[in-house]
Amino acid sequence: MAAKDVKFGNDARVKMLRGVNVLADAVKVTLGPKGRNVVLDKSFGAPTITKDGVSVAREIELEDKFENMGAQMVKEVASKANDTAGDGTTTATVLAQAIITEGLKAVAAGMNPMDLKRGIDKAVTAAVEELKALSVPCSDSKAIAQVGTISANSDETVGKLIAEAMDKVGKEGVITVEDGTGLQDELDVVEGMQFDRGYLSPYFINKPETGAVELESPFILLADKKISNIREMLPVLEAVAKAGKPLLIIAEDVEGEALATLVVNTMRGIVKVAAVKAPGFGDRRKAMLQDIATLTGGTVISEEIGMELEKATLEDLGQAKRVVINKDTTTIIDGVGEEAAIQGRVAQIRQQIEEATSDYDREKLQERVAKLAGGVAVIKVGAATEVEMKEKKARVEDALHATRAAVEEGVVAGGGVALIRVASKLADLRGQNEEQNVGIKVALRAMEAPLRQIVLNCGEEPSVVANTVKAGDGNYGYNAATEEYGNMIDMGILDPTKVTRSALQYAASVAGLMITTECMVTDLPKNDAADLGAAGGMGGMGGMGGMM
């Protein structure tokens, strides 16, 4: 086991604080509408330019192991805020630095660290309740666009795109961000249910100009099995041909004689048919077939529940207004399923989302909800260079997370104003002893830090602006983009409540742990020079030549 280097008390805390400051100082220059960029060197390819706090934090690794421990603990604050709310990483880092700095001063002055931590925790718990009281719902497109704009560093086009996407696919819809091909940002919306399976034979194509299969008002046969024998399908095919409508077959697979017969029938114009594989694998495929059945008002033909394909009737088939099938995707538009059944299915999947343990499962379930309840929107980010594309894509993703958080828990006045108002409301909060009172003051003073940093990044004097904002009330604050005072909500400067709350809670959590640290242990660096010196002694063997 390697030897350890151990530091105690003030020595440990000073080193830790130094690491915290290096990381926080690098991250906090990005805060606010006039925040600066940070350039990150990459081992290959062009450097990355970013204003995303968590991207900067993730790159920082310090040589001194004690300092690095401090930096890594604050990095955890940024990562946690990012995982929970998707934004607010820089705010969380600024708050953590402020609480740690003030808290360690109090510890150095002889205060009891445990009581300080209790005071900080008490202030933060009260502050979270006050934030919830200040929060207003965010439901209209204008507010959503404003939140997106602020989070994307005052880029109005991004805010409007996200609001438009949410309008089109609903609050439950899936919105993804991809690289665009041009200079302009674009929004693509897929209506209806789309899954990533294309036609099984190009002979089904009836729109050669687009290379697609389009079926108007088709019947939809859903089978949880491989179909290779055409005799199984004859009763259904005859019934569909009599009804004079097209047929879409979604099955585990359609192969051999069955596929060949379907192709021949289609080419001769006897019945218009297309076949695709069912999406997903294993249990997920069964679940997705059931989703499609609910959406189209059909029944999944499955031998597990005693249903046979030969006995299927038109009543077992689903229906939709239109189906479009490409080489890689199938889109079902306007299924005729009952709204109550669809909502019941959505509620069932939501329950599974709450119980899911892995992020992958949760994401796949969320996609299924979106396909049933809303739709899928794709924001294609346009940029002139790859470096700009990466930076802009990160901003759009941040803005998307922020708007989702805003819809979930509402919004408060932005620009650090909400925390200032919360701190002033808690001015009379008291703990059980004087040291807890100091902890409360540490937390309340730290709540001014985000506003001060935003102002500092503008090149203004933080104390002057902070005192002016504190003298006002309600949503009165400082708009750093235009450098004027006014009602933040009227000016469209909004922060999602969830983002502000998460930033404060995670900052206080890690800061409390660091304030109560009394000892730090790390590996001693290996002395490579000594090892090499020992090996070098073997060179003397060359003298053995004299023995002849």
UniProtKB/Swiss-Prot annotation:
The GO terms this record gives for MF are: ATP binding; ATP-dependent protein folding chaperone; isomerase activity; unfolded protein binding
Q: What is one GO biological process annotated to this record?
A: protein refolding
Query: If you read the UniProt record, what top EC class would you report for this enzyme, in one word?
Result: isomerase
- Under Enzyme Commission nomenclature, its number is 5.6.1.7
Q: Which CDD domains match?
A: GroEL
Pfam families linked: Cpn60_TCP1
**Which InterPro entries has this protein been placed in?**
Chaperonin_Cpn60_CS, Cpn60/GroEL, Cpn60/GroEL/TCP-1, GroEL-like_apical_dom_sf, GROEL-like_equatorial_sf, TCP-1-like_intermed_sf
Which compartments does it reside in?
Cytoplasm
* Cellular component annotations (GO), alphabetically ordered: cytoplasm
Alphabetically list the UniProt keywords: ATP-binding, Chaperone, Cytoplasm, Isomerase, Nucleotide-binding
SUPFAM superfamilies named in the record: GroEL apical domain-like, GroEL equatorial domain-like, GroEL-intermediate domain like
Report residues binding ATP. Answer: 30-33, 51, 87-91, 415, 479-481, 495
Report which reactions are catalysed by this protein. Answer: ATP + H2O + a folded polypeptide = ADP + phosphate + an unfolded polypeptide
Matching PANTHER family: 60 KDA HEAT SHOCK PROTEIN, MITOCHONDRIAL
Q: Its biological function?
A: Together with its co-chaperonin GroES, plays an essential role in assisting protein folding. The GroEL-GroES system forms a nano-cage that allows encapsulation of the non-native substrate proteins and provides a physical environment optimized to promote and accelerate protein folding.
HAMAP family per the UniProt record, alphabetical: CH60
Family to which this protein belongs: Belongs to the chaperonin (HSP60) family.
Q: What does the subunit section of this Swiss-Prot or TrEMBL entry state?
A: Forms a cylinder of 14 subunits composed of two heptameric rings stacked back-to-back. Interacts with the co-chaperonin GroES.
Report the protein name in the record: Chaperonin GroEL
Source species, please?
Escherichia fergusonii (strain ATCC 35469 / DSM 13698 / CCUG 18766 / IAM 14443 / JCM 21226 / LMG 7866 / NBRC 102419 / NCTC 12128 / CDC 0568-73)
What does the organism's lineage look like at the top? Bacteria, Pseudomonadati, Pseudomonadota, Gammaproteobacteria, Enterobacterales
